[in-house]
Amino acid sequence: ADLFTQYRPLFTGGLARLSQGVVFPQGYQAHAATETCPGHSTILTGAHPGNNGIIANNWFDLGLAREDKRVYCSEDPTVEGTSSASGRYAPSPQYLRVPTLGERMRAADPRSRVVSIAGKDRAVIMMGGRGIDESWW
């Protein structure tokens, strides 16, 4: 379902301004990592997965100090007692190596507010980056 189109008539204020923008219904990303986390991080940073640090939703890091070597794209594996396999992890943009659009907006104007809302933590974190004012998932 296209929720943006469905709820567009109800938008007011800043959200209504989205209707004045541009829509790319057949947008294309020139990289092979077609999972959510690398897709969101690529769109909101302008950098391909190899450069932005988010190569997949999950990958293995044999250098991790914990027994579980699987890494979730939006976790901080240095938080003790966490494991992506168990579902108990600390959400974090730790692996994101470049600034997001929100971070660049704030750098240009400190009055900018960065709000990231999505159905999953990885989408919120990859789209909002560091220093999110509000994050909901």
What is the predicted function of each stretch?
Residues 47-137:
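His/Asp/Glu-rich, glycine-adjacent segments
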